[in-house]
Amino acid sequence: MHNHPRHEGHLHTVNVKYGYVVFLLSIVHIVVVATVPRLRKVGSSSTRRSLPWLPQIVIWAILLAILGVWNIHEWSEHYNVSIKRFGRMAYCLLPFDILLAYKYWPLENYLQNLNLHKWMSRIIVVCSMIHGIGYFVKWFVEGTFFHHLFKIDNLLGVVVFAAAVVLLVVSVALFRRQSYRLFYVSHNITIGMFVVLILFHARPPVTLFVAICGLLLAILFFIKFQTYSATPVSLKEVPNSSLVLVSFPWPDHIATSFKPGSHVRINHSNRSWKSWVFASHPFTSATLPGTSETLDLVVKKGTFIFAKDTQYNLSSPYTSLSFDDNSISRFDQSVIICGGSGISLAIPVFKYLITKLDVTMIWCTRSKADLFVLRHYSLLDKVQVYITGNDSLSVEDESEGHGLMHETIELENLEESSKNSEATKQPEILRGRPDLNNVCASLETTPNSSCVISCGPRSLVKDCENWCRNHKIESVTEIYEM
């Protein structure tokens, strides 16, 4: 790849072993993440839980910080060895980070792995920035900045460095939520540049890791297009509602794979350039085979535009939460609290749990017009509804209920005819936000056999998580956001 080595002597190759150390540690990490939840399940009827992602990130940050400066003598003379090492360690972590982005693999909770992927990516970017900024400072101090900068192999590294900085900025939650597409495109471009350009930049070469990354990305790309095509059989919406009920035919070859809480990813047809450039969108199936003739999605208007007589690509189902007889066997009662389009996960889970234990379902939504969803599934008299907006709510709000659980509207009954609601199959409708101490009060008498399932916007889920933490009650959560 290079006509002659840039550096002579043992210092040129001293960092190679550290790259292999980091790679081997990442393999150990994969094995641990894959096996620990299964070991926890052996001999226990408790819910299988993934390892918390935050301690894993902290451990990696500490390990890399130690390895980055390990065994460097005469620091003032050989500090450049540390600078080079951070760059190599960053690249050798890339296969692990790519693997964490897989949606179909045996490492348990996909959404939990997504958090790990997000923060591992940031660690890789930080290590790369230490490498890049370190060399910028070195060249500037030596007075050789422009001499080194415009050498082709160095310039390729600078290009990757610039892309990584841009990615770090657009990955911040504020920017990512405002324009997920910009983040997604930037992310893919940066990964592609990282994998390819570093092949020509790194000294000594990282050919093995380039090959591994290339293989993993090729598999990921192949999986992305392992979809089936389907056309909506119906689109149901009502005036003033922010929700749309979209129905697809069940895919014959994978219909039995759907479980309560299963998700599918939907994208435009392969004939559209959008399917090649933009990310597919995750949706939760509100129905299950055997109980419904169609695969139904409850979609917030504006998140993904569906049109009848238009073909879409649908992925195989995947789950981030496990609801089966074994995982719920230790629970006697549960409260399901959902917000907005989070009703799509709550409906099949509620229908499954209601035959197993004492379960209450609460739905926080912006408008009474959204109740057509409950009416469609004959759940009007089985759900407590909290209206957090008003009937003239604009449906163009992109934030899926930011601050949903922080409204200060005084609680009041909206249904004057609530006393005969059972006869007319009307839900219990209240204005404002639910008081978790009130709606979950029954769980406090048996905290060890109770759980709260929350799904929807981040604010709602975090409120429920905090309440459960304070009352030592198990929390099962899913946040609805890209």
UniProtKB/Swiss-Prot annotation:
Alphabetized InterPro entries for the sequence: FAD-bd_8, Fe3_Rdtase_TM_dom, Fe_red_NAD-bd_6, FNR_nucleotide-bd, RBOH/FRE
EC number(s) stated in the UniProt entry for this protein: 1.16.1.-
Subcellular location: Membrane
The keyword Magnesium is assigned to this record: no
GO BP: any one term: reductive iron assimilation
One Gene Ontology term, aspect cellular component: plasma membrane
Domain FAD-binding FR-type: from-to ranges: 225-348
GO molecular-function terms, A-Z: ferric-chelate reductase activity
Membrane-protein topology: Multi-pass membrane protein
Transmembrane segments: 16-36, 50-70, 87-106, 123-143, 155-175, 182-202, 205-225
Keyword Heme: no
Enzymatic class: oxidoreductase
Domain Ferric oxidoreductase: 86-198
Pfam families from the UniProt entry: FAD_binding_8, Ferric_reduct, NAD_binding_6
Keywords for this protein: Electron transport, FAD, Flavoprotein, Ion transport, Membrane, NADP, Oxidoreductase, Transmembrane, Transmembrane helix, Transport
Family of the protein in this entry: Belongs to the ferric reductase (FRE) family. AIM14 subfamily.
Purpose of the protein: Probable cell surface metalloreductase. May be involved in iron or copper homeostasis.
Name this protein carries in UniProt: Probable metalloreductase AIM14
Organism of this sequence: Meyerozyma guilliermondii (strain ATCC 6260 / CBS 566 / DSM 6381 / JCM 1539 / NBRC 10279 / NRRL Y-324) (Yeast)
Gene name of the record: AIM14
